[in-house]
Swiss-Prot record:
EC code(s) of this entry: 7.1.2.2
Catalytic activity: ATP + H2O + 4 H(+)(in) = ADP + phosphate + 5 H(+)(out)
Pfam entry (one): ATP-synt_ab
Keywords, ordered alphabetically: ATP synthesis, ATP-binding, Cell inner membrane, Cell membrane, CF(1), Hydrogen ion transport, Ion transport, Membrane, Nucleotide-binding, Translocase, Transport
Membrane topology classification: Peripheral membrane protein
GO molecular function list: ADP binding; ATP binding; proton-transporting ATP synthase activity, rotational mechanism
Record-given protein name: ATP synthase subunit alpha
Positions that bind ATP: G169, D170, R171, Q172, T173, G174, K175, T176
Amino acid sequence: MQLNSTEISDLIKQRIEQFEVVSESRNEGTIVAVSDGIIRIHGLADVMQGEMIELPGSRFAIALNLERDSVGAVVMGPYADLAEGVKVKTTGRILEVPVGRGLLGRVVNTLGEPIDGKGAIDNDGFSPVEVIAPGVIERKSVDQPVQTGYKAVDAMIPIGRGQRELIIGDRQTGKTAMAIDAIINQRDSGIKCVYVAVGQKASTIANVVRKLEEHGALANTIVVVATASEAAALQYLAPYSGCAMGEYFRDRGEDALIVYDDLSKQAVAYRQISLLLKRPPGREAYPGDVFYLHSRLLERASRVNEEYVEKFTKGAVTGQTGSLTALPIIETQAGDVSAFVPTNVISITDGQIFLETDLFNSGLRPAVNPGISVSRVGGAAQTKIIKKLSGGIRTALAQYRELAAFSQFASDLDDATRAQLEHGVRVTELMKQKQYAPMSVAAQAVSIFAAEKGYLKGVELNKVGDFEAALLSYMNSEHAALIKLINETGDYNADIEAELKAGLDKFVATQTW
């Protein structure tokens, strides 16, 4: 075999040109203390706040306390086998979760890993869990509605796309039920949904997932789960993970709805982490930055303008706005809305829906207290027909509450007062609604029209529900074109009013209920 020196030299030159020296410099440290899911690490000189630290066994911790001679980190997962002297490494990365359409219809944990047994997720990339919220210039005012399907909410406390509307109340007052119904109502609206369950029982979450599947809403929803048995770090980070998944749709010119169920448990998990990290406690033993914990999360829910979407998608999507609407849930103790976390979240959000135990126990469900519930920006987003018709509903209920309290002391009431009481009690009865039965815009409009125009006057109180059901069935069969028009346009004019009136007059004259 003859060796050609020219060929050999060319080959050597080629190899030298292609040769790459790759050196990976990663800081290494040693665990010096482990307790309650918190590890203290010595020797990590080059670590960022919030950086992922690699532990043995494909686990990670997140650096939260950067001190002079050590780093305090919280372990994301089991920590029983970690001991003093174990070596750990920095990664140079902050926590990221998978995002994309492949997550729709799936149940994932805080890290975006599937826990529903349906195989791997086909994601469109990764997104950091902590992102700075869009600035003032990048936002657009809220002017499109999110229909929850609840008469009491859509008529009196309307929610717009990009709004943050708090659902607040004691335990067992229907907070989760309201949020789940809002998700079910988005089945055909094009709004993608994210449901974040923090610190709940696994059986409760399984029931929610089953209900979403039964009503055809799971295919449109991402469920992010951090159960009560999981590490405090995972419960604290779950809302941020869910938010990153929702922002994927917002930033691409679509609309998304996210439910945080609930932020009280997230605050408790964060308090636990902070106390274990020896951070100084403040009011109710919460750390000083618990307001920032929720404000930086809820500020990410917004409606962004066309320029933002166009810039983000590099021109792939033009002329479309995107939105992320948030429904945070807060659980109060014995109706105390002046506690630390409830007042914080009330001040951050654009309104709140108060659910009361007394109303719930009296059979008024949803147990919304219209007197202290408010939507600060949703009025601009309300559909035209509901806005026109619902003006008198809130007034009627407010007057009824006032007069009902007064009438307990007054024996003889004049006719006008008695009429107001009669009207108020019927409107209150009309606001009742079954769970998992969200109503369309047209159905709500017909019911409210009947109340506003005095058609409930001669109806017995215990027959109001039957009257409404029979009326909606009649209108759907006899005035299907009108119902379709209202659902599609949400418009209200003299022609629509005349047809609604004619339909109701004929129904009252000819039908029984």
